[in-house]
Design a protein with these regions (language model features):
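Acetyl-CoA-dependent GNAT
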Residues: 3-8, 12-18, 23-97, 108-110, ...
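Short hydrophobic/aromatic beta-strand or adjacent loop that forms the aromatic wall/cage
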Residues: 57, 160-164
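Flexible nucleotide-binding loop
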Residues: 101
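Short glycine/proline-centered loop/turn elements that form peptide/ligand docking sites
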Residues: 104, 108, 130-134, 151-156
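Conserved GNAT acetyl-CoA-binding A-motif
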Residues: 115-126
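Conserved catalytic-core motifs of GNAT/GCN5-like acyltransferases
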Residues: 124-127, 139, 144-160
Length: 170
């Protein structure tokens, strides 16, 4: 079980966090947890972490002793009003040196709190079938598997399942 670090604080992202979040994004992902094609964007001189679909206010930042340790991106799963009650976690990253210290748990708890405050009834996410560590964390925090898209991605010549998980909030 992860050791919870009482020094972890979570706050809303600010525009000035962009460079730090881009760096964190570049060092946090591996082919087992993220898409190599997306990871390659860190080398693009025109890459911006924040976009129209993912502005600063869509992100929560975890800090340990005032240093950026992780982030979570929370946004609607679609633009349709019929799914306005569902928010999705569209990215969760923790710096390698800050793993297993409660950073991801703190981010997920803060995202759940924010989702509830925004009136969401369901919080969903997707995780690679190869990322057993993340899947166990999500299950421990009350997320359940809602579907599996078999062989959805081909990463490094290997087919990987896309696992849809969700937590019902109401």
């Amino acid at each position: 079980m992860a050791r919870l670090d009482s020094r972890v604080t979570v706050r809303l992202a600010r525009a000035e966090d962009e460079a730090g979040l881009a760096h964190l994004d570049a060092v946090a992902w591996t082919p087992a947890s993220g898409f190599p094609s997306v990871m390659a964007r860190a080398n693009d001189p025109f890459f911006t972490f924040f976009t129209d679909d993912s502005p600063p206010e869509a992100h929560l930042v975890a800090e340990v002793d005032g240093r950026m340790a992780g982030y979570i991106r929370l946004r609607p799963v679609t633009s349709l009003p019929e799914s306005a009650h569902v928010l999705g976690i569209a990215g969760l990253a923790v710096a390698p040196g800050d793993r297993r210290r409660g950073v991801a748990s703190a981010l997920l708890a803060a995202a759940e709190q924010q989702a509830r405050a925004r009136g969401a009834r369901k919080l969903s996410l997707r995780v690679f079938g190869t990322n057993a560590t993340a899947a166990r964390l999500y299950e421990r925090l009350g997320f359940g598997v809602e579907g599996i898209l078999r062989d959805e991605f081909c990463i490094g010549g290997r087919y990987v399942d896309d696992v849809l998980m969700a937590k019902h909030l109401a």
